[in-house]
Amino acid sequence: MKTKTTKKTIKKAAKKIKKPSKRKIKKTAKKSRPKKPIKASDHGLIFAKTKKETTEKEDAELANAKAKTKKRRETRSSDPTQIYLRELGFQPLLNAKEELKIARRVHKGDPKARKQMIEANLRLVVKIARHYVNRGLPFLDLIEEGNLGLLTAVEKFDPERGFRFSTYATWWIRQTIERAIMNQSRTVRLPIHVIKELNVYLRTAKKLTQEVDHEATPEDVAHLIDKPVQEIRRIMDLAPSATSIDVPISEDGQKSLVDTLADDNNIDPARLIQNVDLQDHIERWLAQLDERHREVVILRFGLHENEKGTLEAVGKAVGLTRERVRQIQIDALQQLRHILEMEGVTGEEVED
């Protein structure tokens, strides 16, 4: 009896519970559906990006980026400088032991070792050449000139002196690059010692012109730098070729050839006009010295269009210590003095 009564009670309670209408079920279903993308209207609503639209735009941007990258690579691949630098990246560097071993083979005349030593140091040339960019020569020309200095260094390097080759080669590389800038950046070729003399005159004349109301005269310049007026007039005869000194040589026009010349105010330059016969005599006198003494004299006193070198710089160039260069210089000058005496030539005659 109790069981039947309980069932009847449950049925009555169930009937009292209201079932949701079909209309309410539909409304609930509509609310649970995902919202559709908002459409743009004339009132400036933002477009809702669908997944498909976003993917298409990203693909287009990626394709555009790839095209630009490909174009840059093609440009780099056709650039001679980039090609050369990329090739250098594959050249192995030498450690101290390898360098010493190969340098000894070069000293004995091994052509394969010579090639290996050159190729291993081409990057050193590029590194040094970068310091001379925008000074009148293209970058590849600077590298080419530096490579000539590297060849000279390889030929002259003595591995038994205790120097690293890079230290020795740097001097020769810089020397050839600087000489090329002086020689090739001019419309008229002049010897290095003449350019230096001309440099002193130009700087002095420019300074005087700024201080006085008229253009500096040879007498003004001669008085200021303590030189004979006649010598200054000889410099003025070079005026047609000297005018190119102030021509801008950098791309931005901020640097002229005169800016690339060293300031030699503290150096007593060689005479501008040297007698041809005297030059011949000097060559003959130098030829009577041995190779090492002759090389030290040439580098120390700036002969053969070289710059005057300090004892330390010459020592690096020939692979000797500073003191040893000084000793060789003294000995070489004594030999030259003896040669002059044997020919009856005095120091005063040479100076005149």
Swiss-Prot record:
<dbReference type="InterPro" id="IPR013324">
    <property type="entry name" value="RNA_pol_sigma_r3/r4-like"/>
</dbReference>
<dbReference type="InterPro" id="IPR050239">
    <property type="entry name" value="Sigma-70_RNA_pol_init_factors"/>
</dbReference>
<comment type="subunit">
    <text>Interacts with the RNA polymerase core enzyme.</text>
</comment>
<dbReference type="InterPro" id="IPR013325">
    <property type="entry name" value="RNA_pol_sigma_r2"/>
</dbReference>
<keyword id="KW-0805">Transcription regulation</keyword>
<dbReference type="GO" id="GO:0003677">
    <property type="term" value="F:DNA binding"/>
</dbReference>
<dbReference type="GO" id="GO:0005737">
    <property type="term" value="C:cytoplasm"/>
</dbReference>
<feature type="short sequence motif" description="Interaction with polymerase core subunit RpoC">
    <location>
        <begin position="141"/>
        <end position="144"/>
    </location>
</feature>
<dbReference type="InterPro" id="IPR007630">
    <property type="entry name" value="RNA_pol_sigma70_r4"/>
</dbReference>
<dbReference type="GO" id="GO:0006352">
    <property type="term" value="P:DNA-templated transcription initiation"/>
</dbReference>
<comment type="similarity">
    <text>Belongs to the sigma-70 factor family. RpoS subfamily.</text>
</comment>
<dbReference type="Pfam" id="PF04542">
    <property type="entry name" value="Sigma70_r2"/>
</dbReference>
<feature type="compositionally biased region" description="Basic residues">
    <location>
        <begin position="1"/>
        <end position="38"/>
    </location>
</feature>
<keyword id="KW-0238">DNA-binding</keyword>
<feature type="region of interest" description="Disordered">
    <location>
        <begin position="1"/>
        <end position="78"/>
    </location>
</feature>
<keyword id="KW-0804">Transcription</keyword>
<feature type="region of interest" description="Sigma-70 factor domain-2">
    <location>
        <begin position="117"/>
        <end position="187"/>
    </location>
</feature>
<dbReference type="Pfam" id="PF04545">
    <property type="entry name" value="Sigma70_r4"/>
</dbReference>
<feature type="region of interest" description="Sigma-70 factor domain-3">
    <location>
        <begin position="197"/>
        <end position="272"/>
    </location>
</feature>
<keyword id="KW-0963">Cytoplasm</keyword>
<dbReference type="InterPro" id="IPR012761">
    <property type="entry name" value="RNA_pol_sigma_RpoS"/>
</dbReference>
<dbReference type="InterPro" id="IPR036388">
    <property type="entry name" value="WH-like_DNA-bd_sf"/>
</dbReference>
<dbReference type="InterPro" id="IPR000943">
    <property type="entry name" value="RNA_pol_sigma70"/>
</dbReference>
<feature type="region of interest" description="Sigma-70 factor domain-1">
    <location>
        <begin position="79"/>
        <end position="112"/>
    </location>
</feature>
<keyword id="KW-0731">Sigma factor</keyword>
<feature type="region of interest" description="Sigma-70 factor domain-4">
    <location>
        <begin position="285"/>
        <end position="338"/>
    </location>
</feature>
<feature type="DNA-binding region" description="H-T-H motif">
    <location>
        <begin position="311"/>
        <end position="330"/>
    </location>
</feature>
<dbReference type="InterPro" id="IPR007624">
    <property type="entry name" value="RNA_pol_sigma70_r3"/>
</dbReference>
<dbReference type="Pfam" id="PF00140">
    <property type="entry name" value="Sigma70_r1_2"/>
</dbReference>
<protein>
    <recommendedName>
        <fullName>RNA polymerase sigma factor RpoS</fullName>
    </recommendedName>
</protein>
<dbReference type="InterPro" id="IPR014284">
    <property type="entry name" value="RNA_pol_sigma-70_dom"/>
</dbReference>
<comment type="function">
    <text>Sigma factors are initiation factors that promote the attachment of RNA polymerase to specific initiation sites and are then released. This sigma factor is the master transcriptional regulator of the stationary phase and the general stress response.</text>
</comment>
<dbReference type="InterPro" id="IPR007627">
    <property type="entry name" value="RNA_pol_sigma70_r2"/>
</dbReference>
<dbReference type="InterPro" id="IPR009042">
    <property type="entry name" value="RNA_pol_sigma70_r1_2"/>
</dbReference>
<dbReference type="GO" id="GO:0016987">
    <property type="term" value="F:sigma factor activity"/>
</dbReference>
<dbReference type="Pfam" id="PF04539">
    <property type="entry name" value="Sigma70_r3"/>
</dbReference>
